[in-house]
């Protein structure tokens, strides 16, 4: 539940797969990954923080576009665009048009 630069082989692959598919929140106290929370942001307990809310100076000036958290739907901040609108649950399929800064959604 923490990044370790010494990971290799299967543990390295497993950690990265978990980050890209399961990471939604981190524990506020120690920034450890929490893999159980999957609800909307307004249901987030105080001890958890959305992964994208932690300040990361290395990402300053970049915008992160992500999905795989349909419970938060379209969510935009200066630094992130969340696009998962739950197409597999009957919601919409959404995409971000970089050229026009638009989010386009079509029904499932």
Feature-to-residue mapping (PLM):
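Feature recognizes metal-dependent phosphohydrolase scaffolds
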Residues: 1-108
């Amino acid at each position: 539940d923490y990044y370790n630069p010494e990971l290799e082989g299967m543990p390295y692959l497993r950690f990265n797969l978990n980050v890209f598919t399961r990471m939604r929140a981190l524990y506020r106290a120690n920034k450890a990954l929490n893999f159980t929370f999957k609800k909307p942001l307004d249901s987030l307990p105080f001890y958890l923080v959305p992964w994208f809310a932690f300040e990361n100076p290395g990402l300053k000036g970049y915008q992160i576009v992500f999905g795989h958290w349909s419970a938060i739907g379209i969510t935009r901040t200066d630094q992130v665009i969340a696009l998962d609108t739950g197409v597999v649950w009957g919601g919409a399929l959404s995409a971000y048009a970089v050229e026009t800064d638009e989010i386009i959604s079509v029904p499932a």
